[in-house]
């Protein structure tokens, strides 16, 4: 009975995202310019949700930087931070802090309204989102994922 319930809950949670499209979520880049995820339409997208106070998130940034630099990927790699949400710095403080880091290949977008947190039901950090080429949320995975794990999930 427990197995049946577990299978039902997993199937239900996957279907909960079936209609969640993130194309029109309003974000900003590190220059405070407006961005929507729609510019990534056409390729699957991996999104790492993270926070500046999260040591596990910070430990994984070098690997995300390397993955972001790869030219032969068949999926996009972006990261999203939510200023003023879940204990994160405000926008200006985060941008100033991030500019002091050495990661030059990572695309960092800011979700100031917390829309992604709400739509994807982000419970903690790091939190990974996998979007299809139409930017529908197809899978979420909490916790750290290495580059090889990201490739496996993104290419499914």
From Swiss-Prot:
Q: Does the keyword Signal apply?
A: yes
**Domain Thioredoxin, chain residue ranges per copy:** 19-156
The record ties this protein, via InterPro entries, to: AhpC/TSA, Thioredoxin-like_sf, Thioredoxin_domain, Thioredoxin_ResA/DsbE_sf
Signal peptide annotation: 1-18
Q: Which cysteines are joined by disulfide bonds?
A: 54-57
One example GO MF annotation:
oxidoreductase activity
Which keywords appear in this protein's UniProt record, sorted alphabetically?
Answer: Disulfide bond, Redox-active center, Signal
Recorded superkingdom = Bacteria
Q: Which family does it belong to?
A: Belongs to the thioredoxin family.
Protein name, entry field = Uncharacterized protein HI_1453
